[in-house]
């Protein structure tokens, strides 16, 4: 974390836009100043954290309220009068107390994995019920937030959790119970949509698949119910049963095959078959300038900016959160082709770090995340809350491929990382004392 802060400080000092690099005002307020705060919080929490039993209960209740508001907003129900003064077009993209649907999705990607893993790991029935209700609400909120980054992040996380717990039937029972309930909850959204006589916000192809009357989605619901029953029966016979390692390898192979299939589809429709018309979900496999609300164009130009940069900017970037300046020459084309006259970020956290803090900044950031995940896997068996935090960090990190860093939901991601690190340190210290 100190290495990341050092890069931020050096990048700010040598930036041509020093003041904006410090405050982040030219971008999303993610300048050097907020990184100083993040690092201070990191060292305070990782050294002084003391777990309170109901910390995550408060987390579940708070996030549950945000989820519920997002669902109500889907039906144009505005209990907090948040829509007052907004144009109709803005109301369509406004959700819960956060606003922008991409930021709501980012929030969900921090909270929902943690809630699901808390439910899977908690034996207290009351707490399990709280986490269960919150996770079902969270999935419904993910559907109505309707952000591609959120879908990618959470669905990828589901596959990783499947592989991690596949040998433990008692955990897999709760895993498939969660999936069944979340998928069923999405159908409840449809029931209320009918009751609302169609007065709801429009959904894109992915959430429409889960919410509306798609035959395959009902097959998924039935499949999760069957698997839930199978693992329940196995776990009832032996609560501590452990399936053979072959099951783990088979699950890992299936997940790897899914990943390779996605890569193949992307390569096929992006580089080989570039003319076939794609609609709905298949359209996500063709990466071009229009992809992801013209994120494809912004990504391509941002990478070109990096490639054309001098050696200093390649190493430490143009200054934290100052992408708007090197991107300014492309504003006219952005406006003529897509109707947006400006952008101040790459809409990809890693690409944004690459341009604004250089190779060193991106490497330091990735090292922070990767080192925590490695430690989390190592110490999770000693404290299940570690894997809860790791789930949040992984899900957020995946959705960040198509989202932005900002001081609204990113601090929550930092907090989960800090708590996870603190728990790892505590496990390590206990192990050292035991061995000493």
Model-predicted segments: where are they?
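Membrane-interface capping segments at transmembrane-helix boundaries
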Residues: 233-239, 424-433
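Non-cytosolic membrane-interface motifs at loop->transmembrane helix junctions
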Residues: 22-32
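TM-adjacent membrane-interface loops and short helices in multi-pass inner/ER membrane proteins
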Residues: 100, 289, 293-342, 357-361
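Membrane-interface amphipathic/re-entrant loop segments adjacent to transmembrane helices
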Residues: 20, 91, 337-343
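Luminal/periplasmic active-site loops of membrane-embedded glycosylation enzymes
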Residues: 88-91, 216-217, 281-298, 328-329, ...
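Juxtamembrane membrane-water interface segments immediately following transmembrane helices
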Residues: 265-284, 290-307
């Amino acid at each position: 974390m100190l290495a990341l802060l050092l890069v931020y400080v050096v990048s700010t000092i040598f930036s041509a836009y020093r003041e904006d690099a410090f405050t982040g005002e030219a971008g999303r307020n993610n300048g050097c100043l907020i990184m100083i705060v993040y690092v201070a919080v990191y060292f305070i929490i990782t050294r002084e954290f003391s777990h309170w039993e109901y910390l995550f209960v408060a987390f579940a209740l708070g996030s549950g309220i945000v989820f519920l508001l997002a669902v109500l907003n889907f039906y144009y129900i505005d209990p907090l009068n948040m829509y007052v003064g907004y144009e109709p077009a803005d109301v369509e993209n406004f959700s819960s107390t956060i606003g922008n649907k991409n930021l709501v999705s980012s929030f969900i990607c921090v909270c929902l994995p943690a809630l699901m893993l808390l439910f899977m790991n908690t034996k207290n029935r009351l707490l399990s019920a709280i986490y269960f209700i919150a996770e079902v609400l969270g999935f419904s909120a993910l559907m109505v937030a309707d952000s591609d980054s959120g879908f990618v992040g959470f669905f990828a996380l589901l596959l990783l959790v499947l592989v991690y717990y596949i040998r433990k039937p008692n955990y897999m029972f709760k895993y498939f119970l969660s999936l069944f309930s979340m998928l069923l909850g999405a159908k409840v959204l449809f029931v209320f949509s009918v009751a609302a006589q169609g007065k709801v916000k429009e959904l894109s192809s992915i959430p429409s698949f889960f919410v509306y009357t798609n035959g395959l989605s009902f097959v998924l619901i039935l499949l999760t119910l069957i698997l839930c029953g199978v693992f329940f029966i196995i776990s009832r016979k032996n609560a501590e049963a452990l399936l053979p390692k072959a099951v783990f390898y088979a699950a890992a192979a299936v997940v790897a095959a899914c990943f390779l299939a996605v890569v193949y589809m992307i390569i096929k429709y992006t580089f080989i078959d570039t003319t076939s018309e794609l609609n709905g979900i298949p359209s996500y496999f063709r990466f071009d300038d229009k992809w992801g609300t013209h994120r494809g164009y912004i990504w391509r130009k941002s990478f070109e900016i990096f490639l054309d940069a001098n050696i200093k900017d390649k190493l430490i970037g143009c200054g934290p959160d100052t992408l708007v300046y090197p991107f300014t020459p492309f504003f006219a084309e952005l406006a003529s082709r897509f109707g947006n006259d400006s952008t101040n970020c790459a809409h990809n956290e890693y690409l944004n770090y690459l341009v604004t803090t250089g190779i060193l900044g991106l490497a330091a950031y990735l090292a922070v995340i990767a080192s925590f995940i490695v430690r989390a896997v190592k110490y999770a068996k000693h404290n299940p809350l570690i894997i809860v935090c790791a789930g949040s960090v992984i899900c957020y990190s995946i959705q960040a491929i198509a989202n932005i860093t900002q001081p609204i939901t990113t601090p929550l991601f930092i907090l989960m990382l800090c708590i996870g690190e603190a728990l790892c340190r505590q496990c390590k210290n206990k192990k050292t004392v035991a061995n000493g």
